[in-house]
């Protein structure tokens, strides 16, 4: 079990995600489903992701955020804003190239009247493996350094999914 959690809320069509604790791949399936559901809505005006409460974020969840950035760009919607005031997380975001595809700020008022947790889902075998693969491919697509950094991880997932 992960001690991380992702809370969500919205304000005037802007979806807000608040990451807390150690955000690991155990949350990725639920987060991806939530994001896919939200991105199908016609009234979405943007996304803000508050990372100030996160202790750590694994590469799978970073990859899901990269997919979100790409989806917003394809839909001609505003760039996703990441809020991060932690040097370690800021260094990680820059290392994977998020400064090129996200608006990263140290502070922003994200007070919401109502928030709810995105509950984790049980692993669904191949579906989870495919999501892990897609998330890491999204990271690889950001820059050459990521292509090198995640090549072996992607290859391992591809091998696992071969019939």
What do these predicted ranges mean?
Residues 1-53, 70-163:
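STAS-like cytosolic regulatory interaction modules
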Residues 56:
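Residues immediately C-terminal
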Residues 65-69:
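Histidine-anchored nucleotide/phosphate-binding helix
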């Amino acid at each position: 079990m992960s001690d991380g959690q992702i809370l969500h809320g919205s304000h005037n069509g802007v979806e807000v995600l608040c990451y807390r604790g150690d955000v690991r791949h155990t949350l990725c399936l639920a987060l991806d489903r939530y994001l896919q559901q939200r991105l199908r809505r016609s009234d979405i005006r943007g996304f803000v992701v508050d990372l100030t409460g996160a202790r750590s974020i694994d590469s799978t969840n970073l990859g899901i955020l990269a997919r979100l950035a790409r989806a917003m760009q394809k839909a001609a919607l505003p760039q996703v804003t990441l809020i991060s005031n932690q040097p370690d997380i800021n260094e990680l975001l820059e290392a994977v190239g998020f400064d090129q595809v996200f608006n990263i700020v140290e502070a922003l008022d994200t007070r919401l009247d109502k928030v709810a947790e995105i509950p984790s889902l049980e692993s669904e075998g191949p579906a989870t493996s495919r999501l892990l693969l897609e998330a890491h491919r999204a990271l690889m697509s950001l820059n050459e350094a990521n292509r090198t950094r995640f090549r072996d991880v992607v290859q391992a997932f591809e091998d696992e999914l071969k019939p």
